[in-house]
Curated annotation (Swiss-Prot):
Its main location: plastid. This is Protein TIC 214. InterPro entries: TIC214 (IPR008896). Part of the Tic complex. It is found in: Plastid, Chloroplast inner membrane. GO terms for biological process: protein transport. PANTHER family: PROTEIN TIC 214, PROTEIN TIC 214-RELATED. It comes from the Eukaryota.
Length: 1892
């Protein structure tokens, strides 16, 4: 029965999974995979298989296989056997052994004869060869992983070792798997060999038959073949290892020992303490080395964990405070004996002297041959040189950052891959030294039980505290004191003396600033020097490590005084006075000593306890550093500029060239001459740019001498590779043909080309397509030429000495052209003119020749002058530009140009005004371009000859044409005469016939000739008719004339043949009847029956012939007309269908709208009712639909205050109600969800209630809104959601973090500031309807009270509100039911309380130009917005102006969107805000102020009318930058808007504003006081007050030149003071003299460079050539003495544009940025911020930089009150008592009562113990003790009626908390604060939450 049960499918699957996941199966699998990694070690094995035969061959094969398996087994064993692993893992050892062995092996194979004559016996030689085969296979297997590295498959076993618990079983099974795979491989090779030997086809080959001994020769040469293969593989693999002798030797700054000594002197304070307690300190040279927090060095934050207080190799033994001594401690392989502890300064100084002598003596002894060959500190491998400005040399990352060690996690022992190595070493050291200390080994179950017990204990304590706080809340004791306050670090509980916020480790975020650098180390040491050291100190680390019992540990920690655990004064965290140092009582001291020495027993031979007092020293470690200080090219140039002796750069940076664009060679005659300091080395006479090569950067900051092929992330996998590719993107690279197996791609390309060709053939008649194709062909040609130019330029760059050769050749060509070739051509031309009896043109030619200028340019094309050469032109390259190039003309013609032509336009003849000289002496348009075709000298001559020949030909042709016409007339006349003669003859014949009929001849044979004559007449007439008709048809020139003519001719021929046949038949018949008798004459006057048939058939053929001719002639036109008629009918029908439907639809909608308006007017009383938060949605529909349906505007002054934001909801439901057939069941889940009731109007609810869709409780809750104080969290959450700028993260990051409804929250409402809405309506009776809102006065008074709150209350409430908002958000995120939640799509349906939100009637005009940037789209998606008019963009998170595809025909629409007129706007008010806050999310769209005062009344149409507001606004936001030519800056700017706390650069860039703006704004506000309501006056006053407060903080005015420098320094002192101060002090250039600035501009530029800003000149494609030409022409004009001629010609050619040329001499940075010339971007320097700051930047969403926090502090309250409803839900009793505190007590997450640290701890501990499936034990106490959770949370009980949701809340961790928890766990539990390691764990960041 049990056997049958095992065959159940479920049991089979589980059995199968168990077998598959077992260690044995995994080991077999990995071992089998390692077989596939066939490396060079297989060469010997296959050699024995191929070559050896007979008995000896069998033995050799066995020995080869045995050696191979033994070698592999040794490799497997070495994984766990440490000595073997160290022996095989040392690269020096393996290399030294491998090189002689390989040499011996090749010598053995090639010189066998040398050994043959010496062999004593055959058997001994045979045994030796067999042993050699065994050794070969064994040793080469050991080399495989080091000298001959195999693939990754061979290392899979090593990787899986650390995941496997049963290690030996895994190793054994993997070896067995490898053995099985090896046996299979060998069998397969044997089968292949047998198949080759037995195959007849191979034997029957012609080549093999021709040579019978080919196989035997091949077998004999097999040894040589295998030797060659082995040699090739060895060379290939060894080539990847740098040669020990040939590698580049770097010049170190000093020997490693000297470096250690300097580091010791600089960073370490060696302190030896005498017996009497006096301290003899050796002071450092520069830095204070005390480990105090206040003197912390500014070390790179990424290396914070490796921060050094270290010595070199001569560092002393770290002193411990325990009195036991180690017998011998090895430090850096040097023994430090116990005598060094017993004596004072004398012994320690002797020890140092002894060690110095020892080091010098052992210098040569410790450097064996291997060390000389292999310098471990040489840059052989392509490692990154990580610079650190704070430390002299770079940190050496020799090994991986991962350290595997066992640690306890979740109560179980697990391997941690990031265990602190120092801690592991320390633990092992203690275990080795304390050999008698054997702690009890706990089993895993005991560990887990103990851990669970402790965890449960702590969780209960937290839960109890939490429940007590909730119970107090339940008793309605609303007090902020209930909330757990923030933990602070204090040294005295009674006095409450806290550590400053800056240094408090419990605080984080904006409070954690930068640790400031203190003064000289002497003063600090004097401050911290301790006069009387305490007699005894306890090491806290030892007390914790050596205590195993938890309860004993608690008792121990209780007995230890907290102050006793502090370190010495130099190491203490707090600056405690001497009086505050507490001493331990004698009894406590004895207890502690007994406790410690019961565990830690010192050397039994020495039981004396030392009475000396020893200070605690910090445990530190030595971080390996490179002994070489390497510099790059930039640092080398800086050193040269500073006139310091600098070494050659060792870091290969990207190829670049310094392009000098301006050199100041003129005498300084300006105002700056006096201030110029002749001794100042920093005075720059050049302006240069760095031009980088367009080649792919193969260097990547590699160090000289290192192997480029060994780089990790950039591989070279082709023989010739143009670009560097990362292996990560190898699948996206275009592979060569032999790598690509994809056939679909070429097929698609062929089919696409074929379809395009067919289409082009169809539309080839259209000229537009032809033009487009021509333009495209031109663009493609231009791209090809540009690519070719770049390739040529890069080729000249890459070749050795190419620039020298090219520059010399160019100079030679220039001289040859100017002074030899062109003068000789002029001489030859004029001599030829004289020989041809023409006047010579010496003066004209010489004038043109003198006009040609050869300007020397830089390699990039920047012009210098004729005589000036660029700097380093031989190495950097040169270009020669020819201005007004001379072109030899056969003659000169003087023609005056017409004056009406525009001289600015380029003419075709002026294209050749400049060119560049090539190496071959040719001319080209652009540098390195293809040579252009020069104007030919003989071309005008040939043209003149052609013209004369043409004239002569025309005269001849005229004579010939006249002669031809005469001959044609003569022919025509002869034809007409001939025709007249023939017609007259026929007429005469007819007369004769008539006469013969009247007078017949009376004899018998005359009757038949008469009939015959009649037949001939008919035939003649018919022939005549046919001829005429054919002539008529022939005269008409139709399209298909040839076809018609051919058919007519065929018919004519056919009828003629029929006639001829009839005539022949008649003639024969006449001949037969010629001799008839006289009897027949009696019936001679009668026509016979046959004649009648003949006559009728004749007529019939004539009719058929005529009809056929007519039909053939008209058939083609009939078909065309018929087709066109069909097309026209179809087209008209298609056009009429939508027109009629549209007309019917418009008429029906008009009727519906009129009925709707009529019904609305009937319900006017219902509209006028005053509600607290709602507006009737029908009036909104009427307004919007009336404007949409273009009803005539009858009264423009009628106004109504309503909320257009409800348009979207109302319009949708209105359309739904109009639908006759609607499936309401689809709306049931939306409408029955309890959250929807908060956002629906009453009318909509009633409508759906009648249809049974929504619940009746919706109306019930809605009806309570006016009766109770509404505390609904849903609306608060929604309004809060709109106001939080923290959740506008970087777009791609936010989409990963937020839940579904957050991804769809893009339809935020835009702001509107005009106070009245002109409502257009069709009814004249409508009047102004004022909605008197109850909350207006309250909100305004709240605004007034808000600024009266002191700073502490503000901070508390903002903090509280912040946590409240986050918890609300997390609660709602748990409870969302559908990703497409209806209210996530909706607009804000609430009416603004304090400010009636209203809009201009032309709604499509408002935000069009604001949307032309990457601004968060939810701020610009109102219902009347331009985006809705142009399409549905609501699914997009961010909006880009490139999406809008404008056509030319839409230009009128665009103009209609923007109202540029200033008429009828007198009554519109404008609130001028100094910082125009457009965004709701507290993001600043910074404002650049106008420098001059503008009078709007005189500038009609100068401002765009956004919402009709901008008549008086003097400031406009910056965001139109993207329409300029700096796209990078706009992207960075938008990213900075979203996260403004990264670098507070806004004070630096945008606030250099004049003070006059404030006065101007205040004056304008006074003018408008009469138009503004009292509450609005308060807002404006507050804004002005804010501006006045802000002015001394951040805005130093650049008003006059005299004040600029002084104000500039004050601005620098105030802006970014905290951020930049320390970094400036530690700048490398801090030892320089202070500059005496010549001008304010130079001071500003130096300021930006000091702040490490990157500024660049960037041009787009549209402005590329324009700006380049202007820069080049400006640089040329600066050098010329008389530049007038060049200026005029440049303007005529269009090279120089006067608009770009700025006439102002001194331009401030703000003006440069405003004009779009300069962009400034702060360089992201990681060394500027400490690790905490970077960590909280990347992880914490809550925290904002303190500068941002201070700036936004004024605007937060105002913006919240003006634009949000967050503070509008105020309790009624608070309104009555004029208490304006916000009500934040509706806590949706009860855990908010706890502090963030305890909240995190509680959640983590709950998740640790979540073993119970029902999950209710966690909340049972909470639910029993608290009366009603819903009352605590909110007054809407239905929000928390579902218990499952509350349980789900407990399991939910909001992503913000999750990120924090993850970071904290990584940092503290696993010692991972590195970003790369942090990303490894990010995969498991969001495990699926189970509903328990």
């Amino acid at each position: 029965m049990m056997i049958l049960k095992s065959f159940i499918p479920g049991n089979l699957i589980s059995l199968y999974m168990t077998i598959i996941n077992s260690v044995v199966m995994v080991g077999l699998y990995y071992g089998f995979l390692t077989t596939l990694s066939i490396g060079p070690s297989y060469i010997f094995l296959l050699r024995a298989r191929f070559m050896e035969e007979g008995e000896e061959g069998t033995e050799k094969r066995v020995s080869a296989t045995t050696g191979f398996i033994a070698g592999q087994l040794m490799m497997f064993i070495s994984i766990y056997y440490v000595p073997l692993h160290l022996a095989l893992g040392k690269p020096h050892t393996i290399t030294v052994l491998a090189l002689p062995y390989l040499l011996f092996h090749f010598f053995w194979n090639n010189h066998k004869d040398f050994f043959d004559h010496r062999r004593p016996t055959r058997n001994s030689m045979r045994n030796l060869s067999i042993q050699c085969v065994f050794l070969n296979n064994l040793i080469i297997q050991l080399f495989n992983h080091f000298i001959l590295p195999s693939s990754m498959l061979a290392r899979l076993v090593n990787i899986y070792m650390f995941r496997c618990n049963n290690n030996m079983l895994f190793v054994t099974s993997s070896f067995v798997g490898w053995l099985i795979g090896h046996i299979l491989l060998m069998k397969w090779v044997g089968l292949v060999l047998v198949w080759i030997q037995q195959n007849n086809l191979i034997r029957s080959n012609v080549l093999i038959r021709s040579n019978k001994y080919l196989v035997s020769e091949f077998r004999n040469s097999m040894a040589r073949i295998f030797s060659i293969l082995l040699f090739i593989t060895c060379v290939y693999y060894l080539g990847r290892i740098p040669s020990p002798i040939l590698t580049k030797k770097l010049k170190g700054i000093s020997e490693p020992e000297e470096v250690g000594e300097s580091e010791e002197e600089r960073n370490i304070e060696i302190e030896t303490i005498s017996e009497g307690g006096g301290a003899n300190q050796k002071q450092g040279t520069e830095e204070n080395t005390s480990s105090s927090l206040f003197s912390e060095e500014e070390v790179d934050p990424s290396k914070e964990t490796e921060k050094l207080r270290v010595t070199g190799k001569k560092k002393k033994k770290i002193k411990g405070e325990f009195h036991f001594r180690f017998k011998e401690t090895y430090y850096k392989n040097r023994p430090v004996y116990e005598t060094s502890y017993l004596d004072g300064n004398q012994e320690s100084s002797k020890l140092e002297i002894l060690k110095k002598k020892e080091d010098k003596y052992l210098l040569w002894i410790e450097k064996p041959l291997v060390t000389l060959l292999f310098d471990s500190k040489r840059w052989n491998r392509p490692l990154r040189y990580i610079k650190n400005d704070r430390v002299e040399n770079a940190i050496k990352n020799e090994m991986s950052q991962y350290f595997f060690y066992t640690c306890q996690s979740d109560g179980k022992e697990k391997i941690s891959f990031t265990y602190p190595p120092s801690l592991a070493t320390f633990g092992e050291m203690i275990q080795k030294k304390i050999y008698f200390f054997t702690p009890e080994k706990w089993f895993s179950d005991e560990l887990y039980t103990d851990w669970s017990f402790i965890n449960e204990l702590k969780r209960r304590n937290l839960s109890k505290e939490f429940i007590k706080r909730v119970e107090s809340l339940d008793k309605e004791s609303f007090d902020l004191g209930i909330l757990e306050k923030r933990t602070r670090f204090s040294n005295n509980e009674t006095k409450r003396e806290y550590l400053p916020k800056l240094y408090d480790p419990f605080l984080h975020g904006p409070y954690r600033g930068r640790i400031k650098k203190w003064g000289s180390p002497l003063s600090i040491n004097q401050t911290y020097k301790k006069k009387n050291t305490d007699p005894f100190w306890i090491n806290k680390i030892h007390a914790l490590l050596l205590t195993t019992d938890y309860h004993d540990l608690e008792q121990t920690l209780d007995t230890l005084n907290i102050k006793s655990l502090a370190t010495e004064k130099e190491l203490s965290l707090l600056t405690l006075t001497e009086d505050e140092q507490g001493n331990i009582d004698s009894e406590d001291r004895v207890k502690i000593l007994k406790f410690l020495f019961n565990i830690v027993i010192t050397n039994p031979n020495n039981q004396t306890i030392r009475k000396k007092s020893i200070g605690i020293k910090e445990i530190s470690k030595k971080v390996p550093r490179w002994s070489y200080k390497l510099i790059d090219d930039l640092e080398q140039q800086e050193g040269e500029n500073e006139e310091n002796v600098t070494a050659e750069h060792e870091i290969r940076s990207r190829k670049s060239k310094r392009v000098v664009i301006f050199t100041n060679n003129q005498a300084n005659a300006d105002t700056y001459t006096n201030t110029k300091d002749a001794n100042d080395p920093d005075q720059t006479d050049e302006v240069a740019l760095i031009r980088y090569s367009q080649q792919s950067d193969f260097r990547r900051d590699i160090i000289k001498g290192s192997m480029r092929a060994q780089r990790r992330k950039t591989i070279t996998w082709e023989l010739f590779q143009a670009n560097v590719h990362s292996p990560l993107f190898l699948d996206r690279v275009d592979k060569p043909l032999f790598f690509s197996f994809d056939i679909s791609g070429p097929l698609k390309r062929i089919s696409r080309n074929w379809i395009c060709k067919n289409k082009e053939s169809k539309i080839s008649d259209y000229t537009e397509k032809k033009i487009e194709k021509k333009d495209e062909a031109k663009r493609e040609k231009y791209k090809r030429e540009e690519k070719m130019r770049i390739e040529i330029a890069e080729a000249w760059d890459s070749l050795l000495l190419a620039q020298v050769i090219r520059g010399s050749v160019l100079i030679t060509q220039s001289i040859l052209r100017k002074y030899i070739i062109l003068p000789s051509l002029i001489i030859v031309k004029n001599i030829a003119r004289m020989l041809l009896f023409q006047f010579p043109e010496w003066s004209e030619d010489l004038t043109d020749w003198n006009r040609e200028m050869h300007v020397k340019c830089t390699y990039n094309g920047v012009q210098l002058s004729e005589t000036e050469f660029p700097k380093n032109w031989l190495t950097d390259g040169i270009q020669i530009k020819i201005l007004f190039p001379f072109c030899l003309k056969p003659w000169h013609r003087f023609k005056l140009q017409p004056s009406h032509k525009d001289p600015m336009k380029k003419k075709k003849g002026q294209k050749n005004d400049f060119c560049f000289l090539t190496v071959w002496g040719m001319e080209t348009e652009l540098p390195f371009g293809s040579p252009r075709k020069r104007r030919s000298f003989f071309e005008p001559i040939f043209k003149e000859l052609k013209k004369k020949i043409k004239k002569w030909k025309t005269k001849c042709f005229i004579a010939l044409t006249i002669l031809k016409e005469k001959t044609k007339l003569f022919r025509k006349a002869s034809k007409e005469t001939k025709k007249w003669i023939t017609q007259s003859i026929l007429f005469l014949k007819g007369i004769i016939k008539e006469l013969s009929k009247i007078n017949p001849i009376p004899f018998f044979g005359l009757r038949e000739p008469y009939e015959l004559g009649e037949t001939k007449k008919d035939s003649i007439i018919s022939n005549k008719m046919i001829h005429k008709s054919s002539l008529q048809i022939q005269s008409m020139a139709w399209t298909n004339y040839s076809l018609t003519e051919k058919k007519i001719k065929d018919l004519t021929k056919r009828t003629n043949t029929i006639k001829n046949q009839i005539q022949k038949i008649l003639i024969i018949k006449d001949k037969k009847n010629e001799f008839l008798t006289q009897e027949i004459n009696s019936s001679s006057n009668k026509i016979s029956y046959q004649d009648k048939i003949l006559e009728s058939s004749k007529k019939f053929w004539q009719i058929v012939k005529r009809r056929n001719i007519r039909l053939i002639r008209k058939f083609y036109f009939f078909i065309n007309f018929f087709i066109e008629k069909i097309y026209m009918d179809i087209l008209l029908y298609i056009i009429n269908i939508p027109r009629t439907n549209t007309q019917l639809f418009l008429e029906s909608t008009k009727k519906m709208i009129e009925n709707f308006i009529h019904n609305n007017e009937a319900n006017q009383e219902r509209i006028n009712k005053t509600t607290k938060n709602t507006t009737h949605f029908i009036s909104t529909i009427k307004t919007s639909l009336s404007s949409l349906s273009n009803i005539s505007i009858r009264n423009k002054n009628e106004k109504a205050f309503c909320d257009l934001s409800s348009l979207s909801q109302a319009y949708v439901f209105y359309k739904l109600s109009q639908t006759q057939v609607i499936s309401f069941y689809k709306f049931k889940p939306i409408l029955q969800y309890h959250g929807t009731s908060l956002f629906l109007k009453n009318e909509i609810k009633d409508y759906f209630e009648e249809r049974g869709v929504s619940h009746s409780r919706l109306r019930h809750h809605y009806g309570l809104r006016q009766k109770i104080v509404w505390h609904s969290g849903m609306n608060e959450w929604k309004n809060w959601l709109r106001s939080r700028y923290q959740y506008d993260l970087v777009q791609n990051r936010w989409l990963k973090l937020g839940p579904g409804q957050w991804r769809n929250r893009v339809n935020q409402h835009y702001l509107a500031q005009n106070k009245h809405l002109t409502k257009w309506d069709s009814d004249e009776k409508e009047r102004l309807i004022h909605y008197e809102k109850k909350n207006d006065f309250q909100a305004n008074s709240l605004l007034t009270q808000e600024y009266k709150l002191n700073q502490e209350q503000k901070y508390k409430k903002s903090n509280f509100k912040k946590h409240y908002g986050y918890d609300f958000l997390s609660y709602k995120s748990i409870n969302y039911q559908d990703k497409r939640d209806p209210y996530a799509y909706g607009s804000p349906f609430q009416v603004n309380k304090r400010e009636e939100s209203s809009y201009h009637y032309n709604m499509d005009k408002q935000n069009f130009f604001d949307t032309l940037r990457d601004i968060p789209i939810h701020n610009y998606l109102g219902e009347g917005d331009i985006l809705d008019a142009m399409g549905n963009f609501s699914h997009r998170k961010f909006f880009n102006w490139r999406i809008l595809d404008f056509c030319l025909r839409n230009k009128v629409d665009i103009e209609s969107w923007v109202d540029t007129s200033t008429k009828s706007k007198k009554n519109i008010k404008t609130v001028v805000k100094n910082y125009q806050i457009i965004d709701k999310m507290d993001l600043f769209y910074f404002t650049i102020y106008q420098d001059q005062e503008s009078n709007p009344s005189n500038k009609k149409g100068s401002h765009f009318d956004w919402m009709g507001l901008n008549e008086e606004i003097l400031s406009h936001p910056i965001p139109n930058l993207e329409l300029w030519f700096f796209p990078e800056f706009v992207l960075l700017y938008n990213a900075y808007k979203v996260k403004p706390w990264i670098i507070p650069i806004k004070l630096l860039l945008f606030n250099f504003n004049g003070n006059r703006n404030i006065n101007q704004n205040i004056i304008e506000n006074k003018k408008r006081d009469s138009l503004i309501a009292p509450n609005e006056k308060q807002i404006i006053g507050l804004e002005n007050r804010n501006q006045e407060e802000k002015e001394p903080i951040g805005e130093g005015g650049l008003v006059s030149d005299a004040q600029k420098q002084g104000n500039f320094k004050s601005v620098l002192s105030n802006q970014e003071k905290d951020v930049e101060e320390d970094y400036d002090k530690s700048d490398k250039k801090k030892r320089r003299k202070k500059k005496q600035y010549k001008s304010n501009t130079e001071a500003e530029l130096d300021f930006f460079l000091k702040r490490y800003l990157r500024f660049q000149l960037r041009w787009d494609d549209s402005l590329n050539q324009r700006i380049i030409n202007n820069i080049k022409v400006y640089c040329l004009l600066l050098r010329l003495i008389n530049p007038n001629e060049i200026v005029i010609s440049s303007i005529q050619r269009g090279e120089m544009n006067l608009d770009i040329l700025m006439i102002q001499k001194d331009l401030t940075l703000r003006e440069l940025m405003k004009k779009g010339i300069l962009i400034i971007d702060p360089v992201r320097l990681s060394v500027k911020n400490d690790g905490q700051f970077i960590l909280y930047q990347t992880i914490s969403i809550l925290l904002v930089h303190k500068n941002k926090h201070q700036i936004n502090q004024r605007y937060q309250e105002k913006n919240y009150i003006d634009k949000n409803h967050f503070y509008e839900f105020i309790a009624r009793h608070q309104k009555m008592t004029e208490n304006k505190d916000k009500n934040h007590y509706d806590l949706f997450v009860p855990e908010n009562i706890l502090s963030p640290n305890h909240r995190r701890e509680l959640r983590i501990r709950i998740s640790f113990n979540s073993r119970d499936k029902n999950g209710m034990h966690r909340n049972a106490v909470f639910l029993n003790n608290v009366k009603n959770c819903g009352q605590v949370l909110t007054k809407n009980k239905h929000l928390d009626s579902d218990k499952k949701k509350l349980i789900k809340l407990k399991f939910f961790l909001w992503p913000n908390y999750r990120l924090e928890d993850l970071a904290c766990m990584n940092r503290y539990w696993f010692n991972t604060n590195n970003g790369s390691r942090f990303s490894m764990i990010r995969i498991r960041m969001y495990p699926r939450l189970k509903i328990r």
